[in-house]
Amino acid sequence: MKRASELKIVSLLDNYLPPKIRDSVILQTLLENYVWKNSRKHVIDFRLKSFDYTDSDLEEIYENLAIERPSNRPTDLNQTCINEILQSLHGETILEVGSGRGYLSELLSSRGKSVTSVDYVEPHSTPGYQFVKGSVNSLPFEDASFDTVVCAHTLEHVPDIHGALDELRRVTKSRLIIVLPRERPYRWGLNLHMHFFPYMWMLKPLFGQRTHSSTSFKDLGDWFCVEDKIR
């Protein structure tokens, strides 16, 4: 399913179904049979248990899902966000954290950027960039190692979202780009999300007030967030 199609389905479920139906056992059963299928054991109670998971627990879940529920979709980014990322890069050294199947890293590498990517699960191939297996909460790089750091559709999966954001900031030299889904918090969903940002103002407590950086937000179907360091 393309990201644009998924956005329409999520919007329909979140905004037009009454909450009593949206959180009902009926919807759970439909998702089990038509969306989750063989991977239901990993996702049925994920949101209920999500903040008890360790990094190793999450790594195991995502590795199993990559086998049990392989996706034909090359990226979770919609095309508008991809275009905005390409126009927003600073410098030549790029880090993508939560690179998934490697679509964006390959695209940036093909445009002449020096790209490093980090994820729990290794991609099938890394033809034009360096891959490092690891966690957003513990990045194996020196401070200010990359001109631009990109983290798309990842922080919503991380229990310690503030710690992860601090780690992304640590390795950023100039610009940090973060993409987050615009989604309401319900028990049953199409994904393994822990954090939800249905409104733009809910992003501000996450990013906070910082004296040495400036932050901007755009609604591009998903939230497109840019934080620039001020020297």
Residue ranges and their predicted role:
Residues 174-182:
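Conserved beta-strand signature within the Rossmann-like core of class I S-adenosyl-L-methionine
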